[in-house]
Every structure is written in structure tokens, then in C-alpha cells.
Design a protein with these regions (language model features):
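Non-globular, low-confidence helical/coil segments that flank catalytic cores
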Residues: 2-313
């Protein structure tokens, strides 16, 4: 009896062992499936895949993009719409390699437009190098002779244009261009403006980019004259304002900002720059119209995505 009892107990232990092993295996398989998101209803509870999908969706769902590239105390803005790309200003001459690398990283190997607001080095510094390195379909720039702007940087740009036999337009206010899903209109300076070698800033070409739903305004180093002309003669309401003259107090007048009413105001400037940009008065005026101020010296490169309805960044 004792022997049978022991044998019977041994069989019972073996059966429980088998059951435990089977149950453990099932639990392990279910755990793996749950963690990898293969059990229906579980995948959306995993933080990492969900966050990754959201980021990708924002980028792949965008119809066009605006990249306010951090070029220190200078300016460079890249606009991408599918296979179309425009670069507005090109930073200083020492920024060429960085800008070319950035273009490559975001998949831009040619430009439909190279838009140059005015011939100061912090806006056209890398233009010659860019023209020599990648295909540029058309250059848009103010019609300023070398006699008015006698700088090595400007002479180098004109030489590169001649070497590459670039197509150059000298647009005036009111001219409109198409690019992908959007168009852009020249909004300053006045067609009657006569370039003054003492103040090339007021010769800055300004553009208003629009997809019909959202608008961006950019006008180089334009100051009071440019702003007054735009207020009087142009439609300038914009969701995003690339702030004039790096946030100088001589730009971004109250009357001008009241017309633009930007949701976002981007200031391209260098950290601890010698000019003290952005100036306190300009910041106060921007704040007074409810603009969210964004600065490249604090945030680095700033990218906006447009999906036809919304703006994300």
C-alpha cells in the first residue's frame, strides 16, 4: 500500500509538472506577443512605437516645409514642397559647407529658386558656393550694380552667376511666382525705390508665400521704408513672420505688426551677437500682437510643417 501510494504520488507530481510547464510556456508566448504588439488592441498601448509613428506622420503628411536654418548672425530659410525647393538667403560665406550638408540631409540636391533679399554678406555669403555646387534653376535678386555694392562677396556672387550662366530675375513688387503647392509674391520694396549704397537694407526684396490657407512673410533686412510700403500697398497678413533685420528695433514697427498679426515670429540671430539682436523694443512689439517668438540663437534650426490645414513644428 505504501509503495502504491508513493507511486501514485510520483505520478501526480509529474502531471502537475507537465501542466505547470505548459502554462508557463503559454504565459511566456502571450507575454512576448503582448510586448511586441501582436495581440489585437495592445499595440496602441506601447509608448515608443506610438510616439515614433506620430513623428513620422507629421513629417510624411506634410505638403510643404519651411526650415529656418541656424546660421548664427545671418539668415537662411529653406522652403520645400515635394520635389521643389527654394533657398531664401544663404548666411555668411563660412556657412557654405554647413548649408550644403543640410540640404543634402533633407534630400535637396537642386534648387528651383535661389532668392537673395539684398547683397549684404550675412544674406548672400554662401550664394556663390551654392551656385557652383548644385543646380539652380533661377536666381531672384534686387537689381544692384557692383558700383553700388563694392564688396568682394558680391563680386564673387556675380562671377558665379556668370560662370554658371544662371537665369536671373530682378523682380519688383507685385510679381508672383509658382512653386509646387504654393505661390509667392514680391511685396517690397516699392518699384520706385532707388538703391542707396548707404542703406542697402531698404533695398531688401520681400516675399509673401501662400498655399491659400497659410502664409509666410520674409523681407530680409527691410526697415521703415519697406514696412510702410507693405502696409500701404500689399496684403501682408501672415501666420509666420521671419522677423526683419534679425530683430532690430528699426524693424517690426507697431503699425506693420498690426497688419501682419503673426502667430509665430522667427528671429534669426547669433548668440551673444555684437549688435544686441534681438532688441528689447522689437520683442515688446512682437509680444503686443500675440506672436509666439522663436529664436535660432536659443532653439537652433526651426522647422515648420504644413499639411494643408495645420502647422506643426
Amino acid at each position: 500500500m505504501v509503495k502504491y501510494g508513493r507511486k501514485s504520488r510520483k505520478r501526480s507530481i509529474s502531471l502537475w509538472g507537465v501542466c505547470f510547464a505548459v502554462l508557463s510556456g503559454c504565459f511566456f508566448v502571450c507575454l512576448v506577443l503582448w510586448l511586441t504588439g501582436y495581440i489585437p488592441g495592445m499595440a496602441e498601448k506601447q509608448d515608443s512605437p506610438q510616439n515614433t509613428d506620430t513623428v513620422v506622420a507629421e513629417k510624411t503628411g506634410s505638403v510643404w516645409e519651411v526650415h529656418c536654418i541656424d546660421v548664427g548672425q545671418a539668415s537662411a530659410t529653406l522652403v520645400i514642397a515635394g520635389e521643389h525647393a527654394m533657398l531664401a538667403d544663404t548666411g555668411n560665406k563660412d556657412d557654405a559647407n554647413m548649408i550644403l550638408t543640410y540640404l543634402k540631409e533633407v534630400g535637396v540636391d537642386s534648387l528651383e529658386y535661389l532668392f537673395l533679399t539684398h547683397p549684404h554678406e550675412d544674406h548672400i555669403g554662401s550664394a556663390a558656393a551654392i551656385l557652383r555646387e548644385i543646380p539652380v534653376e533661377r536666381v531672384l535678386m534686387p537689381d544692384i550694380s557692383i558700383d553700388v555694392c563694392e564688396t568682394v562677396c558680391y563680386a564673387n556672387l556675380l562671377a558665379a552667376i556668370e560662370e554658371k550662366e544662371s537665369v536671373v530675375d530682378y523682380p519688383v513688387a507685385g510679381d508672383t511666382y509658382e512653386m509646387g503647392v504654393f505661390s509667392f509674391t514680391i511685396v517690397c520694396p516699392s518699384p520706385e525705390w532707388v538703391t542707396d549704397e548707404k542703406d542697402l537694407n531698404e533695398s531688401s526684396l520681400g516675399i509673401r508665400i501662400s498655399d491659400g490657407e497659410h502664409h509666410i512673410l520674409l523681407y530680409g533686412d527691410g526697415k521703415q521704408y519697406c514696412e510702410n510700403y507693405m502696409v500701404a500697398h500689399q496684403e501682408i497678413e501672415a501666420d509666420i513672420l521671419i522677423v526683419g533685420h534679425h530683430g532690430s528695433t528699426y524693424s517690426s514697427s507697431q503699425a506693420f505688426l498690426e497688419e501682419v498679426r503673426p502667430r509665430y515670429a522667427v528671429i534669426s540671430c547669433g548668440k551673444d551677437n555684437d549688435y544686441g539682436f534681438p532688441h528689447r523694443l522689437a520683442l515688446r512689439r512682437l509680444e503686443s500682437v500675440g506672436a509666439e517668438i522663436m529664436r535660432t540663437d536659443e532653439s537652433g534650426t526651426i522647422v515648420f510643417y504644413f499639411d494643408g490645414k495645420n502647422i506643426s513644428f
